[in-house]
Swiss-Prot record:
Organism: Staphylococcus saprophyticus subsp. saprophyticus (strain ATCC 15305 / DSM 20229 / NCIMB 8711 / NCTC 7292 / S-41)
Superkingdom to which the source organism belongs: Bacteria
Name of the protein in question: Putative hydro-lyase SSP0308
EC number: 4.2.1.-
Keywords: Lyase
Tagged with keyword Lyase: yes
First-tier enzyme category under EC: lyase
Single annotated GO MF: lyase activity
Family of this protein: Belongs to the D-glutamate cyclase family.
Listed PANTHER family: D-GLUTAMATE CYCLASE, MITOCHONDRIAL
Length: 261
C-alpha cells in the first residue's frame, strides 16, 4: 500500500494495530496532520489560553470534550488514545516514557487538544517545486528550542520551538507566500537565515527530529512548531501531560484545502 495516498482512517487503524510506527511526514498526502496534547481538566483552561496567545506555534484546531477520545470535526471516529504512532508521557515536567498506546492513562478527566502541524503545508510546497529535505532523506524534520519566549498562561511558559527546512532564498520567498495561506498550521516562517539570532548554535544538533543536509546555496527557514508545548512542559510541570512524539502526528480526516485561505 502507498501510504502517501492512503486514507487517514486506514492509516489510523494501522497505527492502532502497531503496523505503522514511524514518523508521519508524507503520509495521507493532502490531509491535515496535527500535534497532540492531552491534559487533566484542571490544566485545560490555562493551556487553551496558551494556545490562543501563541497562534504561530500552537494554532488550535480542535479540543475534545472532557473524557472524550474523539473530536467534533478533525476525527469524529478517532480514538486519540490509540491512533498516534508514538506518545510521550510527562510527569511533573519530566519525560518518563515513550509508548504506542495511552488508553490506560486516558481517564474521564482528560481533555485533548489538536494543534496545527507544518506537515500540512508541505504538499503545497512540493507542488510549487520547493524541496522538502527531510522527505528526500527519509528523516524526521529537525526541530530546535529557540531563545524566543512564548506568551505565558498560568503555569505554561517557556521558549518556543521551531521546525527547519533548508532552501534557496528565492524558494524561501515563494514558501513564505504559500504558507501565508495556512494560518491554522503555523503560517509564515518565524525566521529566515542566521540561526544564532534565535538562539540555535548548531543546526547539526536538533533538540527533536534529525539533522538534514544544507547545501551551500541554501538558507535555513524556521517555522513555529507544535512541539513547543513539550519544551514548555519542562517549566510548567503539570502532574501529567501526554503528547505525540515529535514527528509522529495525529492524521485527521480534514483535507489540507480546508485550512488554506
Amino acid at each position: 500500500m502507498n501510504i502517501q495516498d492512503a486514507q487517514p482512517s486506514t492509516l489510523r487503524e494501522m497505527i492502532k494495530q502497531g503496523k505503522l510506527t514511524g514518523h508521519t511526514s508524507g503520509m495521507a498526502k493532502g490531509y491535515v496532520q496535527a500535534n497532540v496534547v492531552i491534559l487533566p481538566s484542571k490544566c485545560a483552561y490555562d493551556f487553551l489560553l496558551f494556545c490562543f496567545r501563541n497562534p504561530k506555534t500552537c494554532p488550535l484546531l480542535d479540543v475534545s470534550e472532557k473524557g472524550n477520545k474523539s473530536f467534533t470535526k478533525y476525527g469524529v471516529t478517532a480514538d486519540i488514545s490509540t491512533e498516534v504512532a508514538a506518545y510521550r508521557i510527562y510527569q511533573y515536567g519530566e519525560l518518563i516514557e515513550t509508548r504506542a498506546n495511552v488508553d490506560d492513562l486516558y481517564t474521564d478527566d482528560m481533555v485533548s487538544f489538536l494543534i496545527g502541524c507544518s506537515f500540512t503545508f508541505e504538499h503545497a510546497l512540493l507542488e510549487a517545486g520547493i524541496p522538502i529535505r527531510h522527505l528526500e532523506e527519509n528523516h524526521n524534520v529537525p526541530m530546535y528550542v529557540t531563545n524566543i519566549p512564548a506568551n505565558p498562561s498560568g503555569q505554561f511558559k517557556g521558549n518556543i520551538t521551531v521546525s527547519m527546512r533548508p532552501m534557496t532564498m528565492t524558494q524561501a520567498i515563494k514558501a513564505t507566500e504559500i504558507t501565508t495561506r495556512f494560518k491554522n498550521v503555523h503560517g509564515t516562517p518565524i525566521h529566515i537565515g542566521n540561526p544564532t539570532e534565535i538562539g540555535i548554535t548548531d543546526l547539526a544538533l536538533p533538540d527533536f527530529g534529525e539533522p538534514v543536509t544544507i547545501n551551500e546555496n541554501e538558507v535555513p527557514v524556521f517555522w513555529g512548531c507544535g512541539v513547543t508545548p513539550q519544551s514548555v512542559a519542562l517549566d510548567a510541570k503539570p502532574d501529567l501531560m501526554i503528547t505525540h512524539a515529535p514527528g509522529h502526528m495525529f492524521i485527521t480526516d480534514i483535507p489540507d484545502s480546508q485550512l488554506s485561505d
